[in-house]
């Protein structure tokens, strides 16, 4: 059976994306938590539950949520970046918590704390990943480029601090990390302010 359709009209359907921009959530989750951790690295206070809680919640969950939202928008870079660094924070919290779990000690399956070589390897791989991600940022705004190159430097400084055992290098890394976190906070808040006002008030 054959049907003939005549005078068919073509209509253009425009679908508008009304979902929010997830990048500020991810950038602020990363930035604030990074500043707090690196205040510790700079020697201002010892590692404590505040850093672990922030690493799990705002550093981890917020960035993973941002990653899922970026996925729904079809943004591969945002998906990989926020997802990876969100899971980085979770892995760092686990590295600090697992050796101190009492029930593992009583069951005879306690894991030893990561030694300096293991931690240096861990930090170096994250530095390498960040450096390669920086290449992708060369097509993005300058603020994102600053965040990624400074984060790569931070990871490599922390790697050097672990290998050498130098408190000075770790302290320098801490101050550099504070700058990295502040850069992420600035870009995140700038995007919120610019979008709210409907024009570019703060450059990114």
From Swiss-Prot:
Membrane topology listed for this record: Multi-pass membrane protein
GO molecular function: acetate:proton symporter activity
Membrane recorded as keyword: yes
Chief site of localization: membrane
Keyword set, alphabetical order: Cell membrane, Membrane, Transmembrane, Transmembrane helix
Subcellular location: Cell membrane
Designated name of the protein: Uncharacterized protein MTH_215
Protein species of origin: Methanothermobacter thermautotrophicus (strain ATCC 29096 / DSM 1053 / JCM 10044 / NBRC 100330 / Delta H) (Methanobacterium thermoautotrophicum)
